[in-house]
UniProtKB/Swiss-Prot annotation:
It is an enzyme of class 4 (lyase). One of its GO terms (biological process) is heme biosynthetic process. It comes from the Bacteria. Pathway: Porphyrin-containing compound metabolism; protoheme biosynthesis; protoheme from protoporphyrin-IX: step 1/1. The lineage of its organism: Bacteria, Pseudomonadati, Campylobacterota, Epsilonproteobacteria, Campylobacterales. Belongs to the ferrochelatase family. Fe cation binds at H185, E262. Its EC number is 4.98.1.1. GO terms for molecular function: ferrochelatase activity; metal ion binding. This is Ferrochelatase. It holds the Pfam family Ferrochelatase.
Length: 303
């Protein structure tokens, strides 16, 4: 068996899971860099209690749940129907399904392979490193003897970028805008200053896409969303960019592979009132045929 596990932070599937998500996220040492585990747990509890009601209110506007789990499950189901070389499943970091329960579903031996596939095109310790570490620790804990392969970044992949360009131009054919905003999830500047490669990878990716799209847009803007708290984060903020738009625009959520609250609610709903001009949101790759084609080709090349 070649078991491919997509890794992601996950999205709450009900309002009660909002607290679970926040608690686990802020207990992650890669997210909240407090070395003392007990102090980190206490601070995480305070942050969770302060934020959970607002998060639940936001989720109510999306129908009470994030679309991330359903879309990822659909992606796995479609891939499993499409071929029989790989078995696809997914693991979340902060809400179910967790690594423990997913790995226990399968009987794996030394002749099998586990391919860990974080659904993040750019590397960051807060996403890729954290996810891989949790999975590798659980594999070791369960004494699974299968060979483990890991996939890191894929933002330079030609097929992946052709897919993005195709999705952007398809949306542009219905909503003709001359400005394209690439919105990436922000990170605290302190994490970047410690050597995290995320900002560099995002900048590199934007340059690749700008070159491919230069004949279709007059202006490209990279902005960062989802800032939390008073510390310095990567800039400019997507909300500020939208507030200062001088024409209609398209937004592509460049750091996301699957639509989630940050895309559907934050970009699609919360920021709508900020701009004097209309903007339209381009969907993430999700469970599209083009994304499946990229995944299967990437895995084939890996082997």
């Amino acid at each position: 068996m070649k078991l491919v596990l997509f890794l992601n932070m996950g999205g709450a599937t009900n309002l009660q899971d909002c607290e679970v998500f926040l608690k686990n996220m802020f207990n992650d040492p890669y997210i909240l860099g407090i070395k003392n585990r007990f102090l980190r747990k206490f601070v995480a509890w305070i942050i969770t209690k302060a934020r959970v009601k607002a998060m639940q209110e936001n989720y109510k506007k999306m129908g009470g749940k994030s679309p991330l789990n359903e879309l990822t499950q659909s992606l796995c189901d479609k891939l499993n129907l499409k071929q029989d070389e790989f078995k696809f499943d997914f693991v979340n970091l902060y809400v179910p399904p967790f690594a423990t329960e997913i790995l226990q579903k399968y009987t794996l031996n030394a002749s099998d392979e586990i391919i860990l596939f974080p659904l993040y095109p750019h590397h960051s310790c807060t996403t890729v490193t954290s996810s891989l570490e949790v999975l590798q620790n659980e594999i070791s804990k369960q004494k699974i003897q299968a060979k483990v392969k890991t996939i890191d970044i894929f933002y330079k992949n030609e097929l992946y970028n052709e897919m993005i360009v195709s999705h952007i131009l398809a949306k542009k054919s219905k909503f003709d805008a001359k400005i394209l905003i690439f919105s990436a999830h922000s990170l605290p500047q302190s994490i970047i200053d410690k050597g995290d490669l995320y900002e560099k990878h995002v900048n590199d990716h934007v340059e690749i896409l700008k070159e491919k799209l230069k004949d279709h847009f007059d202006e490209f803007i990279l902005a960062y969303q989802s800032k939390l708290g008073p510390v310095k984060w990567l800039e400019p903020n997507t909300s500020d960019v939208l507030a200062n738009l001088n024409d209609k625009a398209l937004i592509y959520p460049i750091s996301f592979c699957i639509d989630c609250s940050e895309t559907i609610f934050e970009l699609g709903m919360e920021y709508k009132h900020l701009s004097k001009y209309n903007y339209d949101l381009i969907s993430c790759p999700n469970d599209s045929d083009e994304f499946m084609e990229f995944i299967l080709k990437y895995l084939s090349d890996l082997n």
